[in-house]
Design a protein with these regions (language model features):
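Conserved catalytic cores of very large enzyme subunits
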Residues: 2-413, 434, 438-594
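Contiguous, well-ordered alpha-helical segments that form the cores/surfaces of helical PPI scaffolds
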Residues: 135, 417-430, 450
């Protein structure tokens, strides 16, 4: 209960919580009860689906081979969403509760948007994305200063009577500041945690493919030139603002169209992105060869079901996300599979406690079929659990418990039931493989991913669709590791958690190009239809030319989703921030610094 032990609570590390006051405590103290209630409701819908199913099997699965994400949240809460903002223009946020007016100018738009973001976040477990935010902001900028406002950012918009003079550009920056700092504030409806917020950015061809048929309520259409100027200004502004304050949100994703040769269709945007990376900016780049999917979160890629515009409610392809996430503990599953053999102990190295198969064993069809069938049997239960959770959510929706869905911000049937993967590296290591660019590891990865994707397609219904992702698993990766270690399973000794990447993040012998290949279509990208972010950790920033080479290489090999991580450093005395590590503050000389 002490206020200084926030880090020991069950709070997301990315939630901007620094101390635990009574508001945080009130949310945390009920999590055990929430989990029990959530489990009881979930189990009741499983029994409705299959009255003969032994519910003890589900309970055991969730204690061993499966991990239900955020199970201590409220009953029936969706996991994450990418919401349409169109109902925002038609009905304001009154349908979500409270009183408000329809935004009529840029000032009211930015103010009510913050309320919208907090209201949407209060109904879900995880992230809320508003991919259209900057396009809508541009709409109100044009209503304020004309369609060519972006050509005259230095024009003064205040009179001589004003003490502080403002230009179009400085006023826009002020609205950037208002929105950005607001979404980084704590939210009472989320246990005093910030709403996990995501913004999307688009190149010219992705923008036209996504919003080509879009029409605002007044009959006007989005403008690429002004929106492009605005989104670039915001991304550049955010990079500079992060030198003043460590801003967690928004998580930014830039969507670009490429061809199969690895060429970016919008070269101007390509050069801009690489220049921003070279200046130390931090965001994800999403590469696609068609406008058939959208990345709206730090972890998810979701197929766009129908990219046509509905003038009645504004529905368009950006509405997506996950309803629920259940992650497979692959390391334990693979060891359990081997334990089904009567002579499995004969294949265990007594020194390492790892499997001692010949290095080429994975290429044998009988082994592949054995793993495939074992995973399929587990997946049958996973789909039962996911169907049941989907039934629970539809029950909640039928009883009008989801204000955001009733108001048209999101469509329940367009979201996914996600099957996560964790412990991939460790499963491969247990079987004697090296997690690098080799034929055996590639065969293993494709076997796992293709098996799940094949079953996802088989189990799709009109109201339930599935995808697969290599989950970040911030807390799950530690919990699964500790659980397996305590139960006597083999776990690695060089780390105390299960990796979230296809490569081993602590492997210093694997090159950056091989890391990209491991997240390419050759290994996984085509099978992981729910996404797998390739986090490329660098010790220092690269040049624009170097980033251009790497992004072209990603596009060529089919690495769809990546970002570059270089540690920022902050002085704990004067709060000077730099986009590279330092041991001594260059401003005040203090050695009390934090990465």
């Amino acid at each position: 209960v002490k206020s200084d032990n926030t880090a020991n609570a069950t709070i997301d590390d990315n939630s901007n919580v620094g101390t635990k006051g009574i508001g945080v405590l009130n949310a945390e103290i009920h999590k055990v009860d929430n989990k029990l209630t959530n489990t009881e409701w979930w189990e009741s819908f499983v029994k409705k689906r299959d009255p003969n199913f032994n519910i003890k099997v589900m309970r055991n699965d969730f204690k061993t081979i499966l991990y239900p994400h955020d199970s201590s949240s409220q009953v029936g809460e969706p996991y994450c969403m990418a919401a349409s903002m169109y109902p925002f223009l038609l009905y304001r946020i009154e349908k979500l509760g409270g009183k408000s007016a329809v935004p009529k100018n840029l000032d009211s738009f930015c103010g009510i948007y913050v309320n919208l973001n907090f209201a949407l976040a209060s109904e879900i477990k995880g992230a809320v994305a508003t991919p259209e935010f900057l396009m809508y902001m541009d709409y109100f900028c044009r209503k304020e200063w004309g369609n060519n406002y972006y050509l005259k950012p230095s024009v003064r918009i205040t009179t001589d009577y004003c003490i502080k003079q403002k230009t179009i550009g400085s006023q826009i920056d002020q609205y950037f500041q208002q929105v950005t700092y607001s979404i980084n504030q704590i939210a009472g409806a989320r246990g005093m945690q910030s709403p996990f917020t995501n913004f999307s950015f688009f190149d010219k061809y992705f923008f036209e493919g996504m919003f080509g048929e879009f029409v605002f309520p007044d009959g006007t259409k989005p403008e690429w030139n002004s929106t492009n100027w605005l989104q670039r200004r915001y991304l550049h502004w955010l990079n500079q603002e992060r030198l003043k304050c460590i801003l967690t949100f928004p998580v930014c994703s830039y969507a670009c169209l490429t061809d199969k040769e690895g060429n970016f269709k919008d070269l101007d945007t390509f050069h801009f992105i690489c220049n921003e990376y070279a200046q130390g900016n931090s965001f994800f780049t999403y590469l696609s060869r068609s406008v058939d999917s959208l990345s709206s979160c730090c972890r998810l890629q979701n197929a766009v079901q129908e990219n046509t515009f509905n003038t009645t409610n504004g529905q368009i392809g950006i509405m997506t996300g996950s309803k629920n996430v259940i992650t497979l503990n692959l390391n334990r599953i693979i060891q359990d599979w081997q334990h089904t053999w009567s002579d499995y102990k004969d294949h265990i190295d007594v020194n390492t406690n790892k499997c001692c198969f010949p290095v080429d064993w994975i290429t044998h069809k009988d082994f592949q079929e054995g793993i495939k069938k074992y995973i399929e049997n587990i997946l049958e239960r996973v789909y039962l659990y996911q169907y049941a959770y989907n039934d629970l959510m539809h029950w909640c929706k039928d009883h009008h418990l989801y204000a955001a869905y009733d108001a048209g911000f999101i469509n329940l049937d367009k979201q996914y039931l996600t099957i996560g993967i964790n412990g991939l590296n460790q499963a491969a290591e247990y079987l004697g493989m090296e997690c690098n660019n080799n034929i055996y590891y590639k065969t293993f990865c494709r076997l796992i991913f293709s098996t799940i994707k094949e079953q996802n397609k088989k189990h799709k219904t009109k109201t339930a669709q599935f995808n697969t992702e290599q989950v970040p698993a911030e807390s799950a990766s530690v919990k699964l590791y500790n659980r397996d270690k305590a139960d006597g399973y083999w776990v690695p000794t060089d780390t105390n958690l299960y990796a979230s990447y296809i490569f081993k993040p602590n492997d210093t012998h694997i090159s950056i190009l091989d890391k990209i290949i491991l997240h390419s279509s050759e290994f996984a990208a085509d099978e992981l239809d729910g996404g797998s972010a390739c986090h490329l950790n660098l010790s220092e920033h690269l040049s624009q030319k170097q980033y251009e080479y790497l992004l072209k290489f990603m596009a060529k090999v089919g690495c769809k989703y990546a970002t570059f991580n270089i540690p920022n450093c902050e002085c704990e005395e004067c709060h000077f921030i730099a986009k590279q590590p330092f041991s001594k503050c260059p401003k005040c000389g203090s050695t009390h610094v934090s990465l």
